[in-house]
Regions:
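Short helix/loop capping segments that flank catalytic or ligand/cofactor-binding pockets
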Residues: 60-64, 156-159, 237-239, 251, ...
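Short hydrophobic beta-strand that contains or immediately precedes a catalytic carboxylate
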Residues: 51-56, 228-229
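Classical Sec-dependent N-terminal signal peptides that target proteins to the secretory pathway
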Residues: 1-20
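Glycine-rich phosphate-binding loop of ATP-grasp-fold ATP-dependent ligases
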Residues: 187, 201-205, 226-266
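Short, flexible loop/turn elements at secondary-structure junctions
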Residues: 40-47, 56-59, 96-97, 134-136, ...
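Conserved N-proximal alpha/beta basic substrate-recognition cap immediately N-terminal to
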Residues: 70, 98-223, 235
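C-terminal active-site "lid" helix and adjoining low-complexity regulatory extension at the edge
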Residues: 23-30, 56-91, 108, 339-409
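Phosphate-binding site of ATP-dependent enzymes
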Residues: 32-39, 44-50, 244-348
Length: 409
């Protein structure tokens, strides 16, 4: 019994990585020794399997729901422990000013592994130059280190591009997966392969042109009773609308035609996004329920958040899962409120925001993640337009790199 329990805990919380059947060209590893991404996924999870909804960047995420199950800073502690295995110098651009933020990013663990803070790009290069000699243009062409900088922040992006030119062999965290974060279309394309399709809900990408036949076509092709309408690039649950097939036509008309006059007050916040959404298309997914989660004597349709790192080393993609937890909506399944209030989990006006995933489900989740994520990471590397991996090609035996195309209508 004890041996079995130890095996389960090792599988759930072990730092060991998962290898995919994916091989890079021999010359890739000599030029690009290490890629490292810190990510989250939101997913629906039930007895039938796992449906991945979207990717997010771990360095940009709040982990209150996960840390509450352990301790403040636990999630970042796991990331630094993972990054330390490579034996490279670790850098974090701009030291947090307040104590709460320092605790959140597990500063003690970072410093324990000889991590160092730098205020900006010039401070970082100055610190590196203490032990390494730059070449004539001020760059360090052979320097290998792990650098975490939030390049999605407008203030930090110039620092990132400058450092990329001066440290061509450095590993910038989230450089690969960041191209797919909060991009629902690109995420969906990743899964259009045999062996990966089962990890995504059925969906359609539609042009923002309302016509009476649109709802009928969506219902006819997807054959669902309930749908989730989403903007392609909105973040943090903005603009998401849950709707039954009976209300699909009227809802499409509201968001595509009557943008300024929300018809249903309970959806007004979601509808507001559509009045200024810049995309010419949107995505419609089948609604997939999670296994009901009991909290405080009530059942909830929660969304599963998984936190993990992916890295490429020696021509192989690896995945390290840090944990998973349920994100709760504001209302229980049987409450007499709107569909959004019952099913949308990006809500912060509840005293209880999260719930743990039971051990048996965690083991089953790990098996599914071991199958899906390394293959997805290999595809990310292939399809990213990042200059670090231009020309690289990850081969996935048994699958093509160009899968079936979901119809746009």
């Amino acid at each position: 019994m004890l041996l079995g329990a130890c095996f389960i805990m090792a599988l759930i919380f072990g730092v060991g990585s998962v290898q995919a059947e994916a091989v890079l060209p021999n010359n890739f590893q000599t030029t690009h020794p290490l890629l490292l991404d810190f990510n989250i996924i939101d997913a629906k999870f039930n007895q039938n399997g796992l449906k991945i909804l979207e990717f997010g960047g771990g360095h940009r995420s709040g982990f209150t729901g996960h840390d509450n199950l352990y301790w403040h800073g636990y999630t970042w502690h796991r990331f630094w422990e993972c990054a330390a295995q490579f034996g490279l110098p670790m850098w974090y651009i701009r030291q947090p000013r307040d104590e709460q933020r320092k605790a959140f990013i597990a500063t003690d663990t970072f410093l324990k592994h000889a991590g160092r803070f730098a205020e900006n790009e010039h401070d970082l290069l100055a610190q590196i130059s203490v032990q390494h000699q730059p070449v004539a243009d001020g760059s360090f062409p052979d320097y290998k280190g792990i650098i975490l900088i939030n390049k999605t922040n407008k203030e930090y992006f110039p620092m990132y591009t400058f450092l990329k030119s001066k440290l061509p062999q450095a590993t910038f965290v989230c450089e690969t997966a960041n191209h797919f974060v909060f991009d629902k279309y690109r995420t969906d394309v990743l899964f259009r392969e045999p062996g990966l399709k089962q990890y995504r809900p059925k969906c359609m990408v539609c042009y923002k042109r309302y016509r009476k036949s649109l709802a009928k076509k969506i219902i006819g092709r997807m054959k669902c009773d309930m749908f989730v309408i989403k903007p392609l690039n909105a973040q943090y649950g903005k603009g998401i609308i849950f709707v039954t097939k009976e209300d699909l036509d009227s809802t499409l008309k509201t968001i595509l035609v009557d943008k300024q006059t929300p018809q249903r007050i309970l959806l007004s916040e979601a509808l507001e996004w559509w009045s200024h959404d810049p995309n010419g298309r949107f995505i419609v997914e089948e609604y997939v329920p999670s296994t009901p989660v009991e909290v405080e004597g009530k059942l909830f349709d929660a969304t599963l958040r998984v936190i993990f790192a992916m890295h490429l080393q020696d021509g192989q993609p690896h995945v390290t899962v840090f944990g998973a937890f349920w994100k709760l909506p504001t209302h229980a399944i049987n409450d007499d409120v709107s569909l959004n209030q019952i099913h949308q989990s990006y809500q912060y006006d509840r005293a209880v925001m999260s719930a743990p995933l039971d051990d048996e489900s965690l083991v089953r989740l790990q098996v599914l993640l071991q199958d899906a994520l390394p293959k997805v990471y290999a595809k990310m590397i292939n399809e990213t337009n990042d200059q670090r991996v231009q020309g690289a090609n990850v081969s996935l035996p048994g699958t093509g790199l160009h899968g079936s195309v979901v119809a746009s209508i």
